[in-house]
Amino acid sequence: YLKEVVTLSAEQETLLQGIIDRLLQGEPLQYIEGKAPFCGMSFIVNPSVLIPRPETAELVDWIISDNTTQQPHILDLGTGSGCISISLSKQMPQATVEACDISEGALEVAKANNRENCTSVTFFHHDILDLTTPLPHSYDILVSNPPYIMQSEATDMELHVTEWEPHTALFVPDNDALRFYRAIAEIGQTEVLKPGGHIYVEINQALGKETAELFESYGYKEVTLRKDIFGNDRMIKCYK
């Protein structure tokens, strides 16, 4: 069946052409629209933050399924858009959730998402790699989706990712690819992670074994490596 032909106004034509031009330049549709879906919610996104991925939603689901009756105090390290922390706060109203990031631009986006989704996450500025600056509380759960893509892997990635999404949230040097996981493991060894507390992280699929061994080397127990929906090593859980 033929649908009714719609005639666009000059203003609408200009707007549509602008969108087409941005798409042709490789800009992600989520940045053009200014929003992206995640865990049944809508999140504001712009080039200050990564676009949420379905694999990360699996990490959120893992935490929720493990903590249905507890009232955990959670810290999201490197929150970006706030998609992890806000989703946990929304689906675990009994939890106290905090989140940090080194990027002020990312924190602005995360705080806006906190308001839009009517959650009560506390956000603050912090550099995960700065082990000298204390964190504000002790937590039951540390969660993170830190930068983990090696610089050498960039050539195999789509241009809409490498040209538009923030490199500081994506890439790590090949010669120190696990730097953020090492920092998280060291943070967890302090009073920041309570005895018996858990760490959940998203990881590089090419470094699953190495990342698991890193947490084991720090004395964490029951280090569990889990695959994502695509069959790739993607998440690790362990406890103190």
Regions found by a protein language model. Give the residues of each.
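Conserved AdoMet
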Residues: Y1-S65
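Active-site beta-alpha loop architecture of Rossmann-like, nucleotide-cofactor-dependent enzymes
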Residues: Q30, I149-S152, A206
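Short loop/edge segments at beta-strand edges and connector loops
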Residues: E33, H125-H126, K227
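Conserved beta-strand segments of alpha/beta enzyme cores
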Residues: S42, T96, S120-T122, K221-T224
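Conserved SAM/SAH cofactor-binding pocket of Class I
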Residues: E55-D156, A183
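C-terminal beta-strand of the catalytic ATP-binding
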Residues: Y148, Y239-K240
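Mobile active-site "lid"/loop adjacent to the S-adenosyl-L-methionine
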Residues: Y148-F180
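Conserved Class I SAM-dependent methyltransferase catalytic core
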Residues: D174-C238
